[in-house]
Amino acid sequence: MRPIRRAFAIAVLCVAALLPVDSSAAGAGKASIETFVTRAIRPVMERYGVPGMAVGIIVKGQTYVYDYGVASTATGRPVTSSTLFEIGSVSKTFTATLAAYARTGGALSLSDMASEHLRSLRGSSFDEVSLLDLGTHMSGLPLQVPDNITNNAQLMEYLRSWKPEHAPGTYRTYSNLGIGLLGMIAASTMHGDFAALMQDRVFSGLGMQHTYFGVPETEWDNYAQGYTATNIPIRMVPGVLAPEAYGIKTTAGDMLRFIAANMGMLDINERLQHAIAGTHAGYDRIGSMTQDLIWEQYDDRVGLKELREGNSDRMLLQANPATRLDPAAPPRDHVLIDKTGSTNGFSTYVAFIPAKKTGIVILANKRYPNDARVTAAYAILTRLDDDASKD
């Protein structure tokens, strides 16, 4: 297993600095970093016909964004620092953050049973499903909300009769419903609307000024057109639990602020920082992957093979036996934490290593395989480490 060593890459193309940048170093490193990022990204765009991508990197306290291609093939509008992408299931990490925020305020405990907060589910299977199960894909709930469910009343009716195939807490089954219910419960315990609470407590708290559930009219021109794997133009259609599970649109720059906060690099509200750190505790073990509160965690010396397996279709679409950690593993710095996200027309990958203050986000306006995202990101992170050994 090849180690990912500490990255000391020379600062280049500074788009939004977290710390002061050395201009001479920036000039010296520009060709090297921009070249290897492009070499990792261009083949992916060509192979899968991706119209546009934005790649954000954090190295040594500096953030950089590289834009490629177009936001729309119809207009030829280029991807820029203002381009908004759908981030799919990476939205779940924000929902986990809001739930952790509610927890730090004493509004809920992860050991609570879901039916304690959703009265209509009392006497159902949710008497045995904890909030922790919902936030770690260990409830047994299916991946998608059934197509015939169009409102919360229908959702509750469906859930009242639902029965898990395995005992909660024993198998990992990736689920939009699980995190959706956790978000619903978190908002209820905070006596507010989910989207409004997220905007007020999380987005604003992190200084994410270009992150939305519903894209405002003033930003519509910045909203990238998405494309399916077969090149059909598409954007996300709102649905039940969509905001909680996959509904966020944002920029590469805003995502870098979120990654930076997850590595303790921003000066933010203490309660919010504590909540973010709480999402990095490890609760379940599946192969080489430790399941955090939505985030997925690996040793920071993880190899590409293990990282690809952890982000494979098997992990997404099948029930995988898991070992619950008791007690939970506390948050650690010497780990690689990641998450993929997709809608029908967009693809996202986020990975960061807290001990190295190094991270990456890849945003694309086309659906393409997780494997290609992980491989490209790993190549970039590894190259940063290779440069570190020469610094």
Question: Where are the language model's segments positioned?
Answer:
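Bacterial N-terminal signal peptides that target proteins for export
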Residues: 1-9
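Bacterial N-terminal signal peptides
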Residues: 9-18
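Boundary at the C-terminal end of the N-terminal hydrophobic targeting segment
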Residues: 23-28
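Short, conserved catalytic-motif segment at the N-terminal edge
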Residues: 30-85, 107-112, 116, 153-157, ...
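Short active-site loop at a secondary-structure junction
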Residues: 46-54, 74-133, 164-178, 243-246, ...
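Short, surface-exposed loop or secondary-structure junction motifs
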Residues: 65-68, 72, 124-342
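Short, gly/Ser/Thr-rich active-site loops of penicillin-recognizing serine hydrolases
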Residues: 288-289, 300, 367-391
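Short, well-ordered beta-strand elements
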Residues: 339, 347-352, 356-366
